[in-house]
Every structure is written in structure tokens, then in C-alpha cells.
């Protein structure tokens, strides 16, 4: 075996009975948990170059008293493969010279499905910055050479239609005026949808400090192939503070003070402070 059992089992949700199992409950058999664990096992090998890894069989047996379950997983590990050639294919609406620097899968590396997935995401985000919000990128390994254990990887690009923003909407801002939110936006209506600008706008809304949660979505406009709306959903949180203090002086005796600060006065986005003192 290439990897010892302890290494392979450390990410399993199912676990053998141990000291902490009573508290964590991770020693209770579940078919769903086992299915997830087998998928994690498959990913473990694919991320380390074993492209022909397979699970040959899984046996689950129960003891006569039905108090314990034994699980045996038989696998075929295969050989480790390295990357030979990396290429782009499909409709490259964004120039190849701009996409190639995003290919983190490199010739000579041990093949990793995780790096392929990361590269898919980077390419989709780059296309999304040019208005191709619903682009699909699928990195595939092919042309496996069993003599030198190498494999080619090609990223197939399907950009889809370029889309534009019809309208930007807000929900959940019961106290805060839309205009306060709108001035933080870097994605604009009628402009091409830009994944990075939509996310930058979400970050700017979050940094206002008025909201505990800010979520962004870009649903398609019904009956349109090239229009989306941008939906920002927020959850408001308290944006003010109250303070009090007590002091003493020979001339005035005890001095009592209080201050109130509101960072989003009446939903306008303005900061207002009040201070009172009495002796």
C-alpha cells in the first residue's frame, strides 16, 4: 500500500470507536457517511496523481450481537501520473495570452484534480469579469501514457452569451436607504456584468458596518438570454453605541456624563453623536 491506513482514515467522517466517539458520535454507522468517506478517499488519490484509482469493493458486516459494524474497503491504487501538456480549447472569447497565466496546472507537476478544479474556477472568474457570467470551464485529463505515466490536461471553455445588468436590487435594508447602499456599488446598471465588481460591491457594503450579512446573486432576467439582475440581500445590525461616565472635581463635585453615537442616523449613512453632562 502507498499510504498507511491512519493517513487515509484521518478525513473520514466515520471512525472506529475511541475515547471521544461517545461525545462526537462519529462511530455510528451511516450509509450516507460511508458514501461521503469513499468520495473523499477517491479525491485523496486523484489529488496525488493516481488517475486510475478505483474502489474495487466495499464490505459491511455486522457482529452477531448487532453492536458493532466492520467495514472493509478494497482499492486498486494504480500508478502515479505527472502532467505532460496543458492546453486551452473551445471558444476563447478572452485571449489565450490572458488565460494562460491562470493555468496553475503545469507541465511536470504530479497531476492533481484539486488544481484542475481551482483552475476551472479561476478561468470562469476571468470570463465573468468580461460579462460571461454563466461561462463553463471543464478541465479534463486525457491521452494517458502508461509507458511514462504522463497525462495531458485540456481546459474546455464554453463562454455562453455575454450578459448585462438590467437592475440592481436590495432587500433586508428596512432601516437603511437604498441610496446609502447604491453609492458603494462598483457594478452599474446597463453595464456588462462583472464578477469581480459584483463581489467588490458586496465587500464595500459589508464594510459599512450596518449589516451582519451581505449576500450577492445574479439571477437571469426571465425570457432574456443576455440580461441579469444583481440582488444584494442584507441583514441589518445595530450601528450605534451608548456610553456613560462619572467624574469628580473639587469645584463641582460629582460629574455625570453620557454619550450616544449613531453611525447610520435614520438610515441616511450619516454619523451623529450626542453628549450630555451634569454635575
Role assignments for model-derived ranges:
Residues 265-271:
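Short loop/turn motifs that connect adjacent beta-strands in outer-membrane beta-barrel proteins
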Amino acid at each position: 500500500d502507498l499510504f498507511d491506513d491512519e493517513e487515509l482514515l484521518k478525513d473520514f467522517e466515520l471512525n472506529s470507536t475511541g475515547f471521544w466517539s461517545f461525545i462526537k458520535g462519529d462511530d455510528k454507522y451511516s450509509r450516507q457517511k460511508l458514501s461521503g468517506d469513499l468520495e473523499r478517499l477517491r479525491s485523496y488519490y486523484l489529488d496525488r496523481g493516481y488517475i486510475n484509482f478505483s474502489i474495487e469493493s466495499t464490505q459491511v458486516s455486522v457482529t452477531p450481537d448487532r453492536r458493532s459494524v466492520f467495514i472493509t474497503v478494497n482499492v486498486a491504487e494504480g500508478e502515479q501520473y505527472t502532467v505532460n501538456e496543458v492546453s486551452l480549447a473551445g471558444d476563447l472569447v478572452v485571449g489565450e495570452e490572458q488565460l494562460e497565466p491562470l493555468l496553475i496546472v503545469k507541465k511536470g507537476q504530479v497531476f492533481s484534480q484539486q488544481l484542475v478544479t481551482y483552475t476551472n474556477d479561476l478561468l470562469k472568474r476571468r470570463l465573468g469579469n468580461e460579462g460571461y457570467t454563466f461561462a463553463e470551464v471543464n478541465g479534463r485529463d486525457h491521452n494517458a501514457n502508461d509507458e511514462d505515466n504522463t497525462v495531458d490536461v485540456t481546459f474546455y471553455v464554453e463562454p455562453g452569451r455575454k450578459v448585462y445588468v438590467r437592475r440592481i436590487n436590495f432587500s433586508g435594508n428596512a432601516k437603511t436607504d437604498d441610496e446609502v447602499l447604491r453609492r458603494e456599488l462598483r457594478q452599474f446598471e446597463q453595464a456588462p456584468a462583472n464578477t469581480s465588481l459584483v463581489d467588490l460591491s458586496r465587500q464595500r457594503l459589508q464594510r459599512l458596518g450596518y449589516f451582519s450579512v451581505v449576500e450577492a446573486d445574479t439571477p437571469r432576467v426571465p425570457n432574456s438570454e443576455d440580461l441579469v439582475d444583481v440582488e444584494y440581500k442584507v441583514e441589518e445590525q445595530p450601528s450605534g453605541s451608548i456610553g456613560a461616565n462619572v467624574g469628580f472635581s473639587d469645584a463641582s463635585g460629582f460629574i455625570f456624563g453620557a454619550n450616544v453615537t449613531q453611525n447610520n442616523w435614520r438610515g441616511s449613512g450619516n454619523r451623529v453623536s450626542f453628549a450630555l453632562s451634569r454635575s
